[in-house]
Every structure is written in structure tokens, then in C-alpha cells.
Amino acid sequence: MAIQVKNNIQWVGQRDWEVRDFHGTEYKTLKGSSYNSYLIREEKTVLIDTVDHKFSREFVQNLSAEIDLKTLDYIIINHAEEDHAGALTELMAQIPGTPIYCTENGIDSINGHHHHPEWNFHVVHTGDSLDIGNGKQLIFVETPMLHWPDSMMTYMTGDAVLFSNDAFGQHYCDEHLFNDEVDQNELFEQCQRYYANILTPFSRLVTPKINEILGFNLPVDMIATSHGVVWRDNPTQIVQRYLEWAADYQEDRITIFYDTMSNNTRMMADAMAQGINEVDPRVAVKIFNVARHDKNEILTNVFRSKGVLVGSSTMNNVMMPKVAGLLEEITGLRFHNKKASAFGSYGWNGGAVDRIQTRLMDCGFETTLALKAKWRPDGDTLAVCRQHGRDIARQWALSPSALTVSAPAVTAVQPASEPEVSCADADLGPRMQCSVCLWIYDPALGEPMQDVAPGTCWQEVPDDFLCPECAMGKEVFDPLSSEAK
């Protein structure tokens, strides 16, 4: 069933109440999702995106009930992922010559999924426009790596609607389409979950891209996303949230997550949480067992936190697998502005804590004292854990706390020193890493494909240099963490 969005714009997407997994099984969609497709009927008839491939036949049937498919003048594909463009093969079988407008990378992605290089592709770039009649145009804005290289947004003049692709969306299914019609707590919870788990690696790109769009000085009366609600009531509120989340976001909270074999590590977590609360009752402390909790909720809480405590029993001299897996995800999400520490119990060798502490440094976190406990914690050991929590609360405080609590001295493990890595020639300075795709520029090697000779330090690399992997500019590069001084 089509739903009117504004004037001659209709939603012709698909709700998916049952979906519980996204990106394989990596993202739990506990509130379902929607695949938002939009039909514009001005002098020209335009379709923006399709739906997930599993709804292809249903989508084409429903669209055929709205219009004669042969009257469709243009198809706009903002993003080629299967939950956006999945119905293209079914649709194009009916109207094979219809022009498809997308980015250059979009053609590569669409062909990679659908294998139809003969389709009528038209490449668009930022600032390009398409006249759709009645004095209205579609203006295109490339948004590479938000969150795929092919991504773009489409703005419709006259109605002032921004078709924003994945940005500002959420995996959230509701019978209502607009943001002012749904539960606000649920909505913003899902917005933050979506940002933390999907867009955080690209936070460095969010603010400049938003500022670029705002720099066009175009009014935005509505933001039509690819998933979840359409923002019609104060649509810029979600833009403001994104600017906050992209700015090394943190709240006054600490997340503790762990896995345990005999509840010994859980006892340590509980005691440390008590100690934190004694010193600073204002801080929110959340504890999660990674074997029993939704990992995306844990990751969202880590994103929100000023600090994280990670615990594991030692098993075969390493950390437990679910903790290792979550730390690998955190490394990829590249959260910033976080403090961290490891803890855990052991029997005869406490290798898990040392490995966690090293992985926390790999995540880019500022690590502080780690804590080990042998066998099952007794009263004295739990007192040490509570004191450790108190020390953490003081060290990580966002604002000074007047409250002091005396307790037994703590026996703690100092964080392992980070190994120093140097370039082949120290005078060339550190290697530089792209914060988007993690490609590394080595001054000793240069980049011959862009005429950057071996032995060229980063300061002398031309300003128009682009990352060979993701085509982003110099501004997204940072010194390789192990070489930063």
C-alpha cells in the first residue's frame, strides 16, 4: 500500500516485521525494519531505490498497481546494497531500458550484485541535477563511505525533501511512517543503536559531509530515510544528533562486559561496579555478560560510555572467545575518546587479562590499571575489586567528586607498554593510516601510482592525494597509532 509522504511523493516500500538479523547475523534488528522506496510523480515519474531482494516480486506487483511501469522515466539508486536495490533485477525485467542514475561506484556495486552491465546507467556527481518537471529538480550529493563507496543522497527542490539513504535512518518497523507518530524513546534508542553499530567507523566523514550539504543553503522540510521513519517534524533534530555522535561522543557512564566460566569474573565485575558507585553515584554503570546479552546493545553502550571495563576468565591461557570477538568488532568500529581497563580471574596463568589489555590498546583506548584475581574471589579479594572500582571512578571522572572512601590497598597490573614501531627511515616521520579503510601510507615506499616518490614524508605529499583504497583525502589520515609520539 502506497503512503503519501508529501504532495506528489509516495512511499512504496516494504515493512519487515519479522527480520531479526542484518548484515548476516551481525546486527540484531529487534524492532524489525523497513525498506523505504519512494515514487515521485511530477511531469516525470521517478523511483528512488527499491526494497530488499526477498520482497522483489511483491514490490514489483505493488508498484504495478500504482503506475504503469512503462511510464517510469527514471530510477535513482542512492545505494546498491541488497536491502536498497534488491528488487532491481525483477523490476528491470519489465522495463529494461529505463535510465538508472547512480554514482560511478554504484554501477560497480549494482553490476556486482545483479550482473547486468547492459542496463542504461547514468553516472551522477555532487551538484548534478535532473529536471523532473513542474519547476522541480533532483540534486545529487555523493556521500562515499557513509557507509559504502557508492552511497549518495538525493535532494528534491520545491518540496525540500532530502532522500538521505542510510544516514539518519534506523532499523525500526512501525505501522506509522513519520517520526512524530511513533514512540520517541524507542525511536532515538534505535537511531543511536544504528549509528553506533554501523556508521561509527566513518564518524570522521559525517561532520564535513553534513556541513557540505548545509553549505548548499537548501531548505530541508523533510528527511526521507532508507530505513525506519521519515523525519517530518523538526527534521534537523536528527542531523544535530549525528553531529554530536560524530564528535568523539561520550556520556558519564561506564560499561562493563565480561565472560566467565565459574562466575568468578562476574563477582569481580559486580564488586568493581559497587566501588564506582560509591565514589561517583552520578555515573551510570551497565554490566553485560557477552554470552547472554545482545552484542549490539553492548556495543551501543560502549559507544555511549566514557570508559569500558572488559573481563574474562583465562581459558587455555587466552581470553574467552566471545570476549575476543567483541573486542575485534570494537576495533573495527573505531570508537574514540574512551578509557579502558582489563580484569579477570584465573587458576594458574592469567594470560587473558594481558591479552585483553593489549587488544584495548589496539582499539585506540587509553588504558589504565588492569586487575587479576586468582581462583574464586574471597572477601579480601572482593574488597580489592571494590577499591579498584573506586580508583577507576576517580581516574575517569568527567568532573571532580568530593566523596572519598577508604579501602584496602589494591594490587594491580600495570598496562603493558605499547611496542614501538618505526619507519625504515626515522627522518621520514611516522606512517599514516586512513581512518576510513585503514590503508597505510609508508613514507619509505611512497605511492608511485600518484607520483609520490619513495622517501616522501607525509608533510610533502600533495594536498590532492587520495587514499588508493577508498579515495578519501589527506584529512582522514592519522599517524599510525603505534608510531604516534
From Swiss-Prot:
PANTHER family: ANAEROBIC NITRIC OXIDE REDUCTASE FLAVORUBREDOXIN (PTHR43717:SF1). NCBIfam families: PRK05452.1. GO terms for cellular component: cytoplasm. InterPro entries: Anaer_NO_rdtase_flvorubredoxin, Flavodoxin/NO_synth, Flavoprotein-like_sf, Metallo-B-lactamas, ODP_dom, RibonucZ/Hydroxyglut_hydro, Rubredoxin-like_dom, Rubredoxin-O_OxRdtase. Residues 30-210 are annotated as: Zinc metallo-hydrolase. Pathway: Nitrogen metabolism; nitric oxide reduction. This is Anaerobic nitric oxide reductase flavorubredoxin. FMN binds at residues 260-264, 342-369. Its cofactor is Fe cation; FMN. Binds 3 Fe cations per monomer. Anaerobic nitric oxide reductase; uses NADH to detoxify nitric oxide (NO), protecting several 4Fe-4S NO-sensitive enzymes. Has at least 2 reductase partners, only one of which (NorW, flavorubredoxin reductase) has been identified. NO probably binds to the di-iron center; electrons enter from the NorW at rubredoxin and are transferred sequentially to the FMN center and the di-iron center. Also able to function as an aerobic oxygen reductase. Homotetramer. Fe cation 1 binds at residues 79, 81, 147, 166. It comes from Serratia proteamaculans (strain 568). In the N-terminal section; belongs to the zinc metallo-hydrolase group 3 family. It is found in: Cytoplasm. One of its GO terms (molecular function) is electron transfer activity. HAMAP family: NorV (MF_01312). Fe cation 2 binds at residues 83, 166, 227.
